[in-house]
Curated annotation (Swiss-Prot):
The gene is aroE. One of its GO terms (biological process) is aromatic amino acid family biosynthetic process. Homodimer. This is Shikimate dehydrogenase (NADP(+)). It catalyses: shikimate + NADP(+) = 3-dehydroshikimate + NADPH + H(+). PANTHER family: BIFUNCTIONAL 3-DEHYDROQUINATE DEHYDRATASE_SHIKIMATE DEHYDROGENASE, CHLOROPLASTIC, SHIKIMATE DEHYDROGENASE. NADP(+) binds at G125, A126, G127, G128, A129, N149, R150, T151, L152, E153, K154, L209, G233.
Amino acid sequence: MLRRFAVIGNPIAHSLSPVIHQMFAQQTQIELIYEKILGDDVKFEQQISDFFIQYGNGLNVTLPYKKRAYELAKIRTQRCTLAGAANTLWMEENQLHADNTDGVGLIRDLSRFLELKDKKILILGAGGAARGIIFPLLEAKPLQLIVANRTLEKAKELQRQFPQINVASFAELTEFFDLIINATSASLSDQVIVLPEEVLSHKPFCYDLAYNQKTSTAFVQYTRNGGCEAVDGLGMLVEQAAEAFFIWNKVMPSTQKILEHLRSF
């Protein structure tokens, strides 16, 4: 029986989710269609309702609607609640369920490159993207997790929710880290957060949550120029999609060849 899925966001034309899920479908021999829905700021909640009334099986949610999707759901997973945002929706017993697969997607992609246990980790940015990855990073038992933001107060808001983290302003960063994660939106507008020289001098592994299929993101290019190994978030996109696919279809697809295929476009 044909299953129906979609991703909703605004903008949405650039989304790779339909391509990724169709490759998962071929691999697992599940018949599905996966569409793009341009989100309407005024009618977003109605769009969600209509999708499931019309026999939709699962819906991914991307910017800028993850918080609204979270608020709309009746039942949320623990990781969704801690993230305060939802990217995966489905109906069960006539109730809207929500999950957030971004964090687990990041951890699975990072595991290709380094072990997180006992590492010193720096997150740049204190917005929704940062909040969504703190809990899974803490579960990996790092030695230290610091959230740095241009305005310290916003980072302190996250610290109140996650007391295990430390916070700093960008200017206060002087120590070395094993891993730096860019969770700011700077790369989306080709801007770079210039870090103190000491922070990059020990050549940390650098990871940008943003991705650019055609070229390197500004953060990846900047940190590579500083001599660091750096990757963008395309792998995270594929891994979070795999987790959503598993939630909906109870089958976990393989991701490595799909990621290689997307990198070779």
